[in-house]
């Protein structure tokens, strides 16, 4: 099985939107309010991610199986952290991983971990040594995945969305 990460292209947008919608439905079925009621990734946001070349896709053979975005702009939500703090070695600049989703037909095969680790590698190849990610407090599957990938829980951040509390994680690389 051929598995690799590549930058998304404009022609990938319909497949990316389908994966995001698949993820939204999975979250809803699990009772997780993340990405619900108009919050979360949409066509405009994802098209901008692709245009800025920050959107990556996990390919399995010739099939787009997953998506994630590497943001190196300062995230206002990550500036204020509650119930903890960023690691002492934190940089003034960092890369945040956002909008991670895996097509449900590929779940249960360890590919979400491959996607997350591949995004970390891509961030490091771009020079990032401080990598951050956050997820909803009820998204236990993502929390497990984040920890398994080597991230450490640092505290809570608040996003400017409904039910915006998120658990924030960080990884410091050399």
Stretches with model-predicted labels:
Residues 25-45:
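Conserved GNAT-fold acetyl-CoA-binding loop/helix
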Residues 116, 123-135:
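Conserved GNAT acetyl-CoA-binding A-motif
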């Amino acid at each position: 099985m051929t598995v690799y990460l590549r930058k998304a292209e404009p022609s990938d947008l319909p497949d990316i939107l389908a994966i995001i919608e698949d993820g939204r439905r999975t979250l809803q079925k699990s009772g997780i309010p993340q990405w619900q009621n108009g919050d979360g990734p949409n066509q405009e946001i994802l098209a901008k991610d692709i245009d800025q070349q920050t959107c990556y896709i996990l390919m399995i053979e010739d099939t787009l199986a997953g998506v994630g975005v590497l943001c190196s702009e300062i995230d206002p939500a990550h500036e204020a952290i509650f119930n903890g703090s960023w690691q002492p070695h934190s940089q003034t600049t960092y890369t945040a991983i956002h909008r991670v989703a895996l097509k449900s037909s590929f779940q249960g095969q360890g590919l979400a971990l491959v996607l997350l680790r591949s995004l970390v590698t891509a961030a490091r190849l771009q020079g990032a040594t401080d990598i951050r990610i956050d997820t909803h407090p009820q998204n236990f599957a993502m929390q497990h995945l984040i920890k398994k990938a080597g991230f450490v829980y640092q505290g809570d951040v608040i996003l400017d969305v409904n039910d915006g509390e998120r658990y924030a994680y960080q990884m410091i690389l050399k």
